[in-house]
Amino acid sequence: MQLSDFDYHLPEALIAQHPPAERGASRLLHVDGMTLSDLSFADLPSRLQAGDLLVFNDTRVIRARLFGEKASGGKVEALIERVLDDHTALAHVRASKSPKPGSRLIFAGRWEAEMVERHDSMFKLRFLAEENVYDILEASGKLPLPPYIERSAEHDDDERYQTVYAREQGAVAAPTAGLHFTDAMLATLQAQGIATAFVTLHVGAGTFQPVKVDNVAEHKMHSEIYDIPQATVDAIAAARARGGRVVAVGTTSVRALESAARHGELKAGRGETDIFITPGYRFRVVDRLLTNFHLPKSTLLMLVSAFAGYDEIFQAYRHAVEKEYRFFSYGDAMLLEKKV
């Protein structure tokens, strides 16, 4: 397929720049083949049944953006992509001139780091303070909002750009389908007999990288680290045994689960995945998908087209634009039925 096959018109006014006034006060578009239902997110429990299993991504967004200057002069900005150990990290670095190995960077006027070496488009940084990287980010980092949110991070984002169940540090972007859930909604689902389980996939900045090839099959996917607990594998098996459906909350949960089942049976464990899901892919684990609306020509739009059907998704997106749904990270949600 061609990249142009995944384009659509989106008025800029529909890109949500702020979260809704209250967490969960979003709309929900249910896509069941060509049948569309306009709902509120509060209606989600009515679309699930006892015995179903919701699988959430419990990654936590780190304050990954650091501002500073090179020891030799000139401003520098670093986006920490992956923490390697207590004192080293891979980062995207923006500066008037790329730092050379051995050069020093000083962030927030207090944290010195050495540029060790280059890794493709990223830089390996070694922080020289006694504090570990996570402590440095917590003290001086800024939350890395997506590039289409055209404002700086505000105090409110510290809470609203995290899910209520986030616990495993390491993401530089939120698993946004989960942002709609409140503690009250989770309690309602539990009382209804709907089970929950967790995976971890640390969302990287690559999730926002544009596809630069015309032939989609030639795209090289970014890689991300994931972890599937044995308890989640067991919960999925139990849901299958009782006739329940596996409902992935977000495309990141899909990528983690489908990666862990790439060779057939779903297996627990930690790994790195560059799985690229496009129309024609056969889903092994996920039965239903809760997700937000995705960017034109993006790999995530390709994933949902593979899941719910290309024609079905593009009809749903045209409907969403017409009905003025809110798009992207702070926008509204969709509940997708798998096309079989």
From Swiss-Prot:
Top EC class for this record: transferase
GO CC, alphabetical: cytoplasm
Protein name as annotated: S-adenosylmethionine:tRNA ribosyltransferase-isomerase
Xref: SUPFAM superfamilies: QueA-like
The protein's role, per its UniProt record: Transfers and isomerizes the ribose moiety from AdoMet to the 7-aminomethyl group of 7-deazaguanine (preQ1-tRNA) to give epoxyqueuosine (oQ-tRNA).
Superkingdom of the source species: Bacteria
An MF annotation (GO) of this entry: S-adenosylmethionine:tRNA ribosyltransferase-isomerase activity
One protein family per Pfam: Queuosine_synth
Pathway(s) per entry: tRNA modification; tRNA-queuosine biosynthesis
Gene: queA
Protein EC: 2.4.99.17
Annotated GO biological process: queuosine biosynthetic process; tRNA wobble guanine modification
Cross-referenced Gene3D superfamilies: QueA-like
Subcellular location: Cytoplasm
Catalytic activity: 7-aminomethyl-7-carbaguanosine(34) in tRNA + S-adenosyl-L-methionine = epoxyqueuosine(34) in tRNA + adenine + L-methionine + 2 H(+)
Keyword Hydrolase among record annotations: no
Family statement: Belongs to the QueA family.
InterPro entries per UniProt: QueA, QueA_dom1, QueA_dom2, QueA_sf
Keyword Cytoplasm: yes
Keyword terms of this UniProt record: Cytoplasm, Queuosine biosynthesis, S-adenosyl-L-methionine, Transferase
Transmembrane feature ranges: none
HAMAP family, alphabetized: QueA
UniProt subunit comment: Monomer.
